[in-house]
Amino acid sequence: MVSFDATEALTPYREGRGYGAILFDRERLRQADAGLFSPQRWGDRARPVDEGGRGGAWFVDAPFGHSVLRQYRRGGMAARVSRDQYLWKGAGRTRSFAEFRLMRELLKRKLPVPRPLAACYLREGLGYRAALLMERLENVRSLADHAQVAGRGAPWEDTGRLIARFHRAGLDHADLNAHNILFDAGGHGWLIDFDRGVLRIPATRWRERNLARLHRSLLKLRGNRTREDVDKDYERLHRAYELAWGRGY
């Protein structure tokens, strides 16, 4: 259950034949308009993010701080129908508003996630497009990068403990992969990309499903390393996870 937050602000807007709304953190943004979510509007201050994902993400040098802009994109077979349009089911169920509120709830629970700044949707007929703007984490590298460069020296145990912490809080991450786990030089870790994530009562089934997805992503990214090498590293991660889970953090 994501609680109400009085520091959120909501503003409607129209664009072309569509209409939408922007949900934003009024402690960080004095006002918000649709231009926040347009890389073209940012011009040279917006640079594409290369690693992971389906495109549609930019680093933005904004007056309110370094940020990341992500436009929601579909994958798989659904992308053949529409790359960036989703079926309208109500404002509260838009991908952007749901992720914005989930991230704010995780921050309230003292979990290491980027701070969301603003989310929007634009409805046209039965569909809508959406985008999310959040703080950028500085000087971090993904677990995918660590694994490819350092192999056995990657932060496997730290990753296991980090995931256990989120699972203890009830986060079911819909896309737990090696690109969505970040570490800085001091070993502090973060999770990112909470699209379709939900808070649940902790249960073995969904926790193991999250971990299995991460294992598959590590195998996919193994490069010249053998499957046996990857499995050994994952076992280190899993052991640390189980120990942290058993201790309650």
Swiss-Prot record:
Signal peptide: none annotated. Gene3D superfamilies: Transferase(Phosphotransferase) domain 1. Keywords: ATP-binding, Cell inner membrane, Cell membrane, Kinase, Lipopolysaccharide biosynthesis, Membrane, Nucleotide-binding, Transferase. GO terms for cellular component: plasma membrane. It catalyses: an alpha-Kdo-(2->6)-lipid IVA + ATP = a 4-O-phospho-alpha-Kdo-(2->6)-lipid IVA + ADP + H(+). Coiled coil: none annotated. GO terms for molecular function: ATP binding; kinase activity; phosphotransferase activity, alcohol group as acceptor. It is found in: Cell inner membrane. The keyword Phosphoprotein does not apply. The keyword ATP-binding applies. The active site is at residue 175. SUPFAM superfamilies: Protein kinase-like (PK-like) (SSF56112). It holds the Pfam family Kdo. One of its GO terms (biological process) is lipopolysaccharide core region biosynthetic process. It comes from the Bacteria. It is a peripheral membrane protein. Its EC number is 2.7.1.166. Pathway: Bacterial outer membrane biogenesis; LPS core biosynthesis. It is an enzyme of class 2 (transferase). Its main location: membrane. Catalyzes the ATP-dependent phosphorylation of the 3-deoxy-D-manno-octulosonic acid (Kdo) residue in Kdo-lipid IV(A) at the 4-OH position. Belongs to the protein kinase superfamily. KdkA/RfaP family. This is 3-deoxy-D-manno-octulosonic acid kinase.
